């Protein structure tokens, strides 16, 4: 869970076995193959939100309020479903499993069981690695 880390301090998040998420570049990239997927701003914010909550379930209403409305996007179930699908396709296009994002029926979504490593950029000079299991 990364909720205590300011988003503007996150350089990269390594999800699972080498999927690199760079929020400021709106990209997902596989470390081994170099396969890259570009995300739109709402998808980037959605993935950040899910990462912030880790394995805790994020309800649809929470996501619609904190991601979609907060970013001026249409806050509808259909739009949320489209963005979850878009994220899963982006993840699989880099060779990683779509199950990195888990649907909890009638409840919401959460991150899967993958390890999450966060690389922080402090003052543009030094990098820190924090590992969450």
Which residue stretches match the model-derived regions?
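Short amphipathic alpha-helical recognition elements used for nucleic-acid or partner binding
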Residues: 36-67, 87
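DNA-recognition element of transcription regulators
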Residues: 39-47, 73-92, 107
